[in-house]
Amino acid sequence: MTALYGHDAAVAAFRESFDAGTLHHAWLLSGPQGIGKALFAEKAALRVLAEGQGRVAAPGLDVPDDHPAAKLVAAGSHPDLMRLERLPRESNPAELARSITVDQVRGLSRLFGTTASMSPWRVVIVDSADDLERAAANALLKNLEEPPPHSLFLLVSHAPERLLPTIRSRCRLLRLSPLVPDAMTSALREALPEASDAEIAELVAAAPGSPGRALAFQGLDIAALDKAMGELAREGDPTNARRSALAQSLALKSAQPRYEAFLTRAPSLVAAEARRRSGRALDDALRTWERAQSLAASARGLSLDPESVVFELAGLLASLAPASASR
């Protein structure tokens, strides 16, 4: 299994609870997208299942690849582990369903309706809890309120504040932070062994703290996208020509990965500009950043029209330009 970088404190907190025999039955793993929350959940689940078969002599959450539990988890066939995640659409298997359904959550009865097969533990990974439809969230809550013995729920969430308060209250919150540059470099170097130092450095800069997003940006010519956004922020767009062109180009179905990159990069560029300002100009930039963050989050969560989103976000970038540039 891939190594976990940059989350030593979170690993230590989980291990301390597990080793003391006080492991909480539900953990809410929170933090920005792409920093390794799902990988943490996978490794924590595997470690608990493996330890249930006997002591594992490996540090942190590591389990040797030749361990029986590791082989089963890697094959997706461990009988004591279930994952709740968005499934491929029946109408178009190339796309994922919009949410995790209540029927999927009810399927946990297959896991908890029998005794554990290989260890005392039965583990559920929810990736992500943000994707639960309302009925599914309520069904999961019932399991969290009355957990079966030796059950462990690992809920991944990019926006825990949007979850049902009752779900949050049943979980122990474990915050995972964005990776520092050295950890980012190590994670990307493992994932992209053939990449040059310059390519790794460009990806680190393109998605600070988030190796998952950095990998998604690979091959998208992020430098060109940043150049277009930078020109908007420096020179403005008095005729709307620049943002119209950008919106049309990123709205194409083939441009979906670049659109996703834009949703990440645009608020980051506004934040970078805010850090260079002071006084009233700083206040204005911070308000612009808040609007950009909110719009990008809504675009992801509500599947807003990409062309309209890009046009509006590009307008926020253009509003950062000096007044003289907009004439």
Regions found by a protein language model. Name each.
Residues 134-135, 165:
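Conserved D-loop-proximal element of ABC-family nucleotide-binding domains
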Residues 1-47, 51-72, 149-151, 158-267, ...:
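Charged, glycine-rich active-site and insertion segments that engage polyanionic ligands
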Residues 30, 126-127:
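Residues at the beta-strand->loop junction immediately N-terminal to the Walker
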Residues 91-102, 129, 173:
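Flexible beta-alpha connector loops of hexameric P-loop NTPases
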Residues 119-123, 148-154:
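Loop/turn-to-beta-strand initiation segments
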Residues 13-18, 99-123, 131, 142:
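Conserved alpha-helical scaffold flanking the Walker A/P-loop in AAA+ ATPase domains
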Residues 128-132, 144, 160:
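Conserved Walker B
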Residues 113, 138-152:
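Conserved catalytic/switch belt of AAA+ P-loop NTPases
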